[in-house]
Amino acid sequence: CIRDSSCWIVWDKCNGDTKWADCELAWTSFNTAVRKFAFMWNGMLQGKNIEEGWIMQGKKHLNEKRIHPTQKPVALYAWILKNYAQPGWKLLDTHTGSASSLIAFADAGYDYVAFEKDIGYYSEYLHRLQEHRSQITLFDCGVERV
């Protein structure tokens, strides 16, 4: 049972005229207004960044690889953290799936605890996290990757 809340998060997938859902909804316990996050997520078409999510990322090699059927973009979690999380919070993800949340948590400097019951997805997300961490270690020196 979901209790009443004034604040829902609406993720507009900016997917145009397709058979897929235009939006996804996330319940929150915050006592604020409904907020919308626009970020393209339609097959190979993915948004550019948090500020320009409705604009297609032009460099396909920078797109997130899909490893889970209900995968969300890292940018969605980054936006949620930016708008709702407080410094010093320790975050919990009980359905980690693709680890998009964990990438956003780590990038923003949050400690976290995560769970995934499917060993296949767990293995995939561990590999994804290791790849992400190695990219940060090797290449993030204030220079934009191309």
Where are the language model's segments positioned?
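Class I S-adenosyl-L-methionine
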Residues: 3-146
